[in-house]
Amino acid sequence: MKQIIPYGKCYIDSHDINEVKKSLKNSYLTSGPFVKKLENNIKKKLKVKYAVSCNSGTAALHLAFISIGLKKKDIVILPVINFVAASNILKMMDIKIIYSDVDINTGQITPAAIEECIKKNTLKKIKAIVTMPLGGFPENIEQFYKIKKKYNCFLIEDACHALGARYRF
């Protein structure tokens, strides 16, 4: 059976509503036990050592860009189809953006397109590549890791659309 999952439609059940009620009745405005529980659940699910929650994907991207030490005039490759937050933050930081073409079927950046961007900018070192699993469909992240290693740059996966999604099962 083929099931269509509508883009942008949320599924909220009674459990979700009850958790929000508990959070609102809690005396913490920020941080607190619910945030710690979320971060611990994400660490467990993704099998990572650290997880820091943010109030938005935009804030998370900003933290990621700061954490890799981006400086003015550094170069970052972004997919041409992307949420505007990444571009806005990089522009605010005075970072040069190279927009990469995307696959016509998936709307996602491809390893071949990244290689093409890098070849066109041979005199400049690429500081980071940002991928985005558009619509919740994870890309072949292993190929991007190979490119990251080959060019000694950072790889940031903007997983707002696909947190917890897996490429291989």
Outline where the language-model segments fall.
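N-terminal "arm"/small-domain region of PLP-dependent enzymes with the aminotransferase-like
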Residues: M1-L29, P33
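Conserved donor-binding loops in enzymes that form glycosidic bonds
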Residues: K9-C10, D101, L134
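Glycine-/small-residue-rich active-site loops that bind phosphorylated ligands and cofactors
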Residues: I12, T30, N82, N105-T106, ...
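Generic structural signal for small/hydrophobic residues in well-ordered secondary structure
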Residues: V20, I42, A60, V76, ...
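Phosphate-binding glycine-rich loop
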Residues: Y28, G32-I75, I89-M93, Y99-D101
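Conserved PLP-anchoring active-site segment centered on the Schiff-base-forming lysine
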Residues: A64-K124
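Active-site phosphate-binding strand-loop segment of PLP-dependent enzymes
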Residues: N105-F169
